[in-house]
């Protein structure tokens, strides 16, 4: 399942590395959390996804299921993770689970597929959250979106930064597909996405609700800033585009 297989227990990673050594790629997955809690204060690095792993490439760095929780601490880092753009393949996969990145955490060089896929279609009660408050940089998603959701609450905190990332996906850099709730309070800058930075999309499964807060800065990007699809709702309380 993964280099570390968590089943209802607690992982506290205060340091160290999971993945390939310098210049060496590991094939497979770093962390598979089937329930339980993971606190990642070390580094997940140099991992290439493979369909031979259980659940394939759904979460090459972190796979969360069964109401598990994972936090990338202020000292935590995920870097140099690659995979194949197909289906829901991604570096971080979370279904009915909570995933958090703290201020100071770093995610970089996730290339060739999605960084994160979030599915919380669970009676539409939005009981789980992806809360991003660290830095995401230098990710080249190719024909995939950087982030994609299917329902769920996704919050970009005031310390969050997404910079120097790229996507040629029809869903843009951040693709909120059906019923998601988004809060943007951080910075999105110096990115390139031909279909835009944020696509609030309803493809027949429920309108998206999004808020841009006073601390938000969506600036210096190549591509339109925000695209609002039918039955989606965007409220701008402040901030800068």
Regions found by a protein language model. Give the residues of each.
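All-beta strand scaffolds that present successive hydrophobic residues in beta-strands
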Residues: 10-18, 37-44, 70-78, 99-103, ...
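Extracellular beta-strand/beta-solenoid scaffold signature
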Residues: 1-7, 22-34, 48-67, 79-96, ...
